Amino acid sequence: MFIIKSMLYRLMQMIVVLFVISTLTFILMKLSPGNPVDKILHLDVAQVSTEQINATKDKLGLNDSLLVQWWHWMNHLLHFNLGKSFESKEPVTQILFNYAPITLLISFSTLVVSLCISIPLGIIAAKRFHKWTDKVIRVISTLSISLPAFFIGIILLFIVTNLMNIDSVILSQFILPVITLSLGMCAYIIRLVRSNLLMLLQSNIVQASRLRGMNERYILIHDLLKPTILPIIPLLGISLGSLIGGTVVIENLFDIPGIGYLLMDSIKSRDYPVIQGCVLFIGFFVVIINTIADLLTLLLDPKQRLQLGNPKIKTNTPLISESSDRHA
């Protein structure tokens, strides 16, 4: 019952967030400098008659008041109609379907690679606390967090194209972007796994298992793995949402025909429907992914369900920031 209430609450929250995103995007597009009519006519304003400009504006509905334009936009949105591109005249939904797969592929591949690398490294760092292995992993994690993704991408491009003289579409448009995005994501997960595991190694349940003669491998798999990984789920939701939104820079850097590339191209041409569609796509996936992450945490963590059923109950689950500061 509490889970159903939580799902309904998240659904209402998602609707409100998407409404705010769509409205803010509409307002920002109307306040931004430039005129899409100039781009559509592909002519200098001095060479186009006023009648042609007004006819084009009437056709696009740009002569209506802002309130009327907003109402038409929201009405179409409720019917899952994002309009047509000013440039290509294609439906925006079709354009998004053409560009979205590569963005989603890179984002989810980055997530898988990050998990496969960061969880083992976080466990190794915790098990070898304050040894040279732990110190090396911490230094690499700190560097990965400190360096911007676009800077890492530029370095990788320079190494592959200039120093190694490798010309491969798969390498430049898939493997390198995944590596670039994975480095920063791995760093956060490694630090979280390490700090959670260090804290759990001092818990009573671990001490009791050791007294019963259980080996360290058994303790890690049966006693520590689930409580270590559970706090990662909310972070994964935030990180994956950020990945989809953050591909704008990476896709333009590596010349990848994804949503980020489409968004930048549409901004240059003042293609309002496509811009609004891209922003809504990114916002929708960010909200959906975070909602799924919250529900998974609720389903897998009994403490969260207990606290949801009785808000007066306070769980003893430590905050991520506190545990990170304690074992950093």
Curated annotation (Swiss-Prot):
One Pfam family named in its UniProt record: BPD_transp_1_N
Membrane-crossing segments per the record: 11-31, 104-124, 139-159, 170-190, 229-249, 279-299
Subcellular localization(s) per the UniProt record: Cell membrane
Predominant location: membrane
InterPro entries named among the record's database cross-references: BPD_transp_1_N (IPR045621), MetI-like (IPR000515), MetI-like_sf (IPR035906), Opp2B (IPR050045)
Entry's Gene Ontology molecular function annotations: nickel cation transmembrane transporter activity; transmembrane transporter activity
A cellular-component GO term for this protein: plasma membrane
Keywords: Cell membrane, Ion transport, Membrane, Nickel, Nickel transport, Transmembrane, Transmembrane helix, Transport
Membrane recorded as keyword: yes
Effect of deleting the gene: Deletion of the nikBCDE operon strongly reduces nickel transport and urease activity. Mutant shows decreased virulence in a mouse model of ascending UTI.
Segments forming domain ABC transmembrane type-1: 100-297
SUPFAM superfamilies: MetI-like (SSF161098)
Induction: Transcription is stable during the exponential phase and increases only in standard conditions in late exponential phase.
Record has Glycoprotein as a keyword: no
Subunit description: The complex is composed of two ATP-binding proteins (NikD and NikE), two transmembrane proteins (NikB and NikC) and a solute-binding protein (NikA).
Membership in a protein family: Belongs to the binding-protein-dependent transport system permease family. OppBC subfamily.
Functional description taken from the UniProt entry: Part of the ABC transporter complex NikABCDE (Opp2) involved in nickel import. Probably responsible for the translocation of the substrate across the membrane. Required for full urease activity and plays a significant role in the virulence of S.aureus during urinary tract infection (UTI).
Protein name according to UniProt: Nickel import system permease protein NikB
Species for this entry: Staphylococcus aureus (strain NCTC 8325 / PS 47)
